Amino acid sequence: MRVSKANALKRWKGSQRRIGITGGIASGKTSIGKYIESVKNTPILDADMFSREALTANQTIKDTIINRYGRTIVDKENTNSKTINRAALGEIIFHDKNERIWLENLLHPIIEKRFEEELEKHKLSSTIVLIIPLLFEANFTYLCSEVWLIYCSLDEQYERLMKRDGLNKEQAKYRIEAQLPLESKKILSDHIIDNTNKLDLSYPQVEVLL
């Protein structure tokens, strides 16, 4: 996966501190974000939340996806509705790079717009946190004044992902390899939080940066 270094190094230059949190899947991004929220009472904007919002509430997006993949990705427990089964959708996009790119091209403009809307709402906040798993891949670094990478070892990443989502190793592998490698993200980030072990050991690193 190629990422433009010039785009990856773009940063927000305004007075508001915008902490962009990224990292690999199951690296602990959300946990670190929640910790910052608890100690700093800082607004949190989450790309995954905006993505879920689009898949559940945006009828145009839902219709577009269903028209492409058919009713195989509609929730089987509620087949009369147009509720998208995210697990079924994941099985498609994590096994086919072209389908993943198609879905990202569909969702990323929606997610970007939601970030811009929420940033405008919180423009008077001195600090705000943006949790964006595909921060570099989606070229969203321009939204952030600084980028923190939440890092963990590959073995730990596999273990957490398999346990969290009930995946086998092959399924976890497809998901991990769909993202830019953590080692590449380290080079493009401003700060690195090592979250390989217990979260309690990561919090002091966060405190130093805050």
UniProtKB/Swiss-Prot annotation:
**Could you provide one GO biological process annotation from this protein's UniProt record?**
coenzyme A biosynthetic process
Reaction catalysed by this chain? Answer: 3'-dephospho-CoA + ATP = ADP + CoA + H(+)
Its pathway, per UniProt, is: Cofactor biosynthesis; coenzyme A biosynthesis; CoA from (R)-pantothenate: step 5/5
Q: Which PROSITE patterns match?
A: DPCK (PS51219)
Where is it localised?
A: Cytoplasm
Q: Which CDD domains match?
A: DPCK
Which residues does ATP bind? A26, S27, G28, K29, T30, S31
As for what it does, the entry says:
Catalyzes the phosphorylation of the 3'-hydroxyl group of dephosphocoenzyme A to form coenzyme A.
Q: What is this protein called?
A: Dephospho-CoA kinase
